[in-house]
């Protein structure tokens, strides 16, 4: 059996920083495994789980490991020691350690910016194919380390789901690991968001090979890992070449060189792109515009006609370097196709082509530098207009450029380095958010003239095949009407000079909560106690966060209240801060709309509260008529009351779903009749199900039949007391009738010998009641004193039993624990009832005497 161990743990311990948990992924990669983008602790734990997991066990991933073992393993890993999980841990502890590592990451595996857009994408799309394409694109915006870790985890979980589908489905695994990947935890306000996250995670596991292993559709992606591999391959192939850092003087006949010639722009175009995984750079040349320049000026001479490229040359790759010539004389664009085997320039001199063009025609020459990644599905052939001839001159074709004005290509000082040096813009981002490729920068629009030739369309980030050329401006669709765009290369969307969009209150609340939580964790680590309010108030920054958080929560609450009243239309969720404006443009409804026309939000009109109440009342009356129920509640039977209660309950739930629970006095006044009827029905049902204790004067108060306290009205409790007294008088009269009847029954039953034994106990009770009813006040007082003494004795005995039980078991005695003294409890209750009866009789016979 293969022993589960981390890859070269002993070697990486020396290079690894002192901590692993709570460290960003990029720092872990730089400190531990520069060539391996998955943290070694993740590989170590996953290998152990696959070897010794016993994944067929039910609930394995849902059982938490031993907390002490997990903490001990964490300390071992943080100290750089070599850990043998086979001997020192168990599977639940290893799984808990893996989840703890994901939870402790400062930035989740799915960064916050992409997380927000993923949630919006899952809500906007019902089409699975379209959702899959959009999701695949967003996943490839992840940083390389995050993408590799997510791919590794999804591969592991997908294997578990495929081999143990009956025990572990993709949905159950997504529910366990989804919150750890997205940093979404079980909070009341995040339950809906957690469901969306689990659904996205389940989709990644169910379609793992489509999202991660299918590389054929990823040529248009921004996967920086594939870009890195491509740059490394090109650097190895061109080690023997000139590195494209020299400047070559290009002789040309019939063209005069001016005294002040600008810099040299050298472009090296390779043909071996189709063998690689991705495209790092490409050059787009508007051949139509170039040949128009040929026809007008006649300064362009080519050695061979420019035709549509073959399939191998449809996508061209280049590295270009800008250098300052000491004499600042000439400008040249070196186009040198290289063979698949990386032949040197001496080996194939006939394959060199030199292209020089005038600087005043430069706006018609669109150069998408190495930051522009081309799609293989796009039409990349160079279109040449008919009727334009190309002259042949020797072996090299040259187009002379009199002056190169780089200001026409970029915004002056915003011109950046070519894309192969992409580490600079990768290091600029310190926030940990997902970065897009530099190809998706802002677009500068230039108005199209009437006689302007068609140019290449800007690369909108829509999915599927799109029109690559803009033809007649009048026939353009809504997405590209009346404007042509030129991409300005930027280092990233997180540039300091790029103005960010305003965040929503929900995003700001989450950000502030995260900052406050980090402060509390740091405070607890330093002082081993949670910060008090005085500690928070002592820190001005944290106090400011708390104040802003309170304001934002109040703002969200007010917005919800206003939206519920229909005062404002719901605001659309803003786009992600890192995605270009053109993203999702295909989602807009294009029919019958233009950019200048405001969109009309069609919202169903919510009926007023009065109209809803009238509708509910009408439905209740119809329902009672169908079931033949009386309108008066007092005439209803118990079954009728149950049906009426159910109908009222459903009606109130419908009202609250439309208008919310009534809060203000006006809202409660509108729906008051409905709530009052519901309360009255509940009270009558309770009253019908309760059997009152005979002879108790407080039956009414103990029977849960209290009337509701209505706001603004005085409650009359004395009337209820009078009613109880009247009920007591009627009770005593009824009791006398019962006693007299029982005496006559006794005289008749004495003659029946067959029923004598059965009726002895009843006769004894009746005689006792009769004697009690006919006794004088002194006799009643004597019985009262005896009953009190007996009650005191029983109470003392029961209290001793309960105290002994508490000392023995450490808890109070429950109902099932009182079985040994059950008879004593019953006797105690009987004596209490007798005492109440005696008190009533004494108070009725002689109200002037006090006990």
Curated annotation (Swiss-Prot):
Q: Which Gene3D superfamilies match?
A: Rho GTPase activation protein
What SMART domains does this protein's entry cite? Answer: RhoGAP
Any GO BP annotation: signal transduction
Domain (Rho-GAP) ranges: 23-212
GO MF, one example: GTPase activator activity
Location of the region described as Disordered in the Swiss-Prot/TrEMBL record: 556-611
User: Does the entry feature the keyword Methyltransferase, yes or no?
Assistant: no
Query: Family assignment?
Result: Belongs to the FAM13 family.
* Name used for this protein in its record: Protein FAM13B
User: What organism, scientifically named, is this protein from?
Assistant: Mus musculus (Mouse)
- Which gene name belongs to this protein? Fam13b
């Amino acid at each position: 059996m293969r022993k589960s161990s981390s890859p070269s743990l002993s070697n990486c311990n020396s290079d690894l920083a002192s901590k692993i948990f709570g460290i960003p992924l990029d720092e872990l990669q730089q400190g531990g495994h520069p060539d391996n983008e998955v943290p070694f602790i993740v590989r170590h734990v996953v290998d152990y789980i696959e070897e010794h997991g016993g994944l067929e066990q039910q609930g394995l991933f849902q059982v938490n490991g031993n907390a002490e073992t997990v903490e001990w393993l964490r300390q071992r890993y943080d100290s750089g020691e070599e850990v043998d999980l086979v001997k020192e841990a168990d599977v639940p502890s290893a799984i808990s350690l893996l989840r703890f590592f994901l939870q402790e990451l400062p930035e989740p595996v799915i960064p916050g910016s992409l997380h927000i857009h993923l949630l919006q994408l899952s809500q906007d799309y019902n089409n699975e194919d379209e959702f899959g394409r959009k999701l695949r694109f967003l996943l490839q915006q992840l940083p390389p380390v995050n993408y590799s870790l997510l791919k590794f985890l999804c591969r592991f979980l997908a294997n578990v789901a495929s081999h143990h589908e009956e025990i572990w489905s993709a949905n159950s695994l997504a529910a366990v690991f989804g919150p750890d990947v997205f940093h979404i935890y079980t909070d009341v306000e995040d339950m809906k968001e957690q469901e969306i996250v689990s659904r996205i995670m389940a989709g990644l596991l169910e379609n793992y090979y489509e999202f991660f292993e299918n590389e054929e559709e990823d040529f248009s992606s921004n996967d920086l890992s594939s870009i890195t591999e491509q740059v490394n391959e090109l650097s190895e192939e061109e080690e023997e070449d000139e590195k494209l850092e020299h400047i070559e003087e290009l002789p040309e006949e019939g063209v005069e060189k001016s005294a002040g010639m600008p810099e040299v722009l050298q472009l090296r175009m390779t043909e071996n792109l189709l063998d690689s995984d991705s495209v790092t750079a490409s050059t787009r040349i508007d051949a139509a515009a170039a040949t128009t320049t040929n026809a007008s000026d006649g300064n362009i001479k080519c050695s061979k006609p420019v035709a549509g490229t073959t399939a191998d040359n449809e996508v061209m790759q280049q590295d270009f370097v800008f250098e300052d010539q000491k004499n600042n004389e000439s400008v040249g664009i070196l186009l040198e196709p290289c063979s698949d085997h990386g032949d040197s320039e001496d080996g194939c001199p006939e394959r060199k082509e030199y292209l020089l063009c005038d600087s005043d025609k430069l706006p018609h020459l669109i150069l998408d530098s190495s930051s522009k990644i081309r799609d293989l599905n796009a039409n990349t052939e160079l279109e040449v207009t008919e009727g334009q001839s190309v002259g042949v001159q020797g072996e090299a074709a040259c187009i002379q450029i009199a002056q190169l004005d780089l200001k026409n290509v970029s915004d002056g000082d915003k011109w950046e380095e070519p894309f192969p040096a992409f580490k600079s813009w990768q290091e600029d981002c310190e926030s940990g958010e997902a970065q897009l490729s530099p190809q998706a920068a802002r677009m500068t629009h230039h108005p199209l003239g009437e006689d302007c030739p068609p140019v290449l369309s800007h690369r909108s980030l829509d999915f599927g095949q799109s029109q690559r050329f803009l033809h007649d401006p009048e026939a353009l669709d809504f997405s590209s009407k009346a404007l042509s765009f030129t991409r300005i290369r930027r280092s990233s969307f997180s540039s300091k000079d790029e103005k960010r969009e305003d965040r929503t209150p929900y995003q700001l609340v989450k950000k502030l909560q995260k900052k406050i939580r980090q402060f509390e964790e740091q405070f607890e680590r330093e002082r081993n106690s949670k910060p008090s309010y005085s500690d928070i108030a002592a820190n001005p920054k944290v106090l400011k966060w708390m104040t802003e958080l309170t304001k934002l929560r109040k703002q969200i609450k007010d917005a919800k209240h206003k939206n519920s009243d229909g005062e404002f239309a719901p605001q659309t969720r803003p786009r992600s801060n890192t995605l270009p404006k053109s993203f999702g443009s295909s989602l807009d409804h294009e029919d019958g709309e233009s950019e200048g026309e405001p969109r009309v939000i069609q919202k169903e009109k919510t009926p007023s509260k009065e109209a809803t109440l009238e509708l509910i009342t009408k439905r209740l009356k119809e329902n009672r008529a169908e079931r033949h129920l009386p309108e008066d509640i007092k005439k209803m039977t118990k079954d009728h009351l149950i049906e009426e209660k159910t109908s009222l309950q459903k009606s109130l739930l419908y009202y609250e779903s439309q208008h919310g629970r009534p809060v203000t006095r006006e809202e409660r006044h509108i729906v008051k009749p409905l709530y009052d009827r519901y309360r009255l029905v509940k009270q009558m049902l309770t009253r019908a199900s309760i059997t009152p204790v005979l002879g108790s004067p407080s039956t009414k108060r103990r029977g849960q039949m209290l009337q509701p306290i209505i706001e603004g009205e005085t409650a009359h409790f004395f009337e209820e007391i009078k009613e109880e007294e009247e009920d007591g008088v009627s009770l005593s009269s009824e009791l006398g009738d019962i006693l007299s009847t029982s005496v006559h029954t006794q005289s008749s039953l004495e003659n029946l010998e067959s029923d004598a034994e059965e009726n002895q106990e009843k006769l004894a009770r009746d005689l006792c009641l009769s004697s009690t009813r006919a006794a004088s006040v002194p006799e009643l007082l004597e019985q009262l004193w005896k009953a009190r003494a007996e009650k005191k004795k029983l109470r003392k005995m029961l209290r001793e039993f309960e105290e002994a039980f508490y000392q023995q078991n450490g808890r109070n005695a429950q109902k099932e624990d009182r079985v040994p003294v059950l008879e004593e409890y019953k006797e105690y209750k009987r004596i209490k009832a007798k005492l109440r009866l005696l008190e009533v009789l004494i108070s009725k016979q002689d109200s002037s005497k006090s006990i």
